[in-house]
């Protein structure tokens, strides 16, 4: 496998891991859809570190792929956090102004 292919494989691996942690795709081992938002944040942090450490050393296509994966995971992470916040708010009694 060429180095460019290895780099794309690494990005794809972390992308799949992020989508699994978002609960968007099933875990290939268990077959279950499981959500772990803390893990998503870790995956995003790893990919951002990878982007920082490879800056200037990757092709335009690799950079575009990495940037796209990070942006997609971040957007979906924020959406899932908002959903969790709405769920939490439904269980709380409303505060009345005074």
Protein language model annotation of sequence segments:
Residues 1-45, 49, 61-87, 91-98:
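N-terminal intrinsically disordered, cationic/polar leader segments
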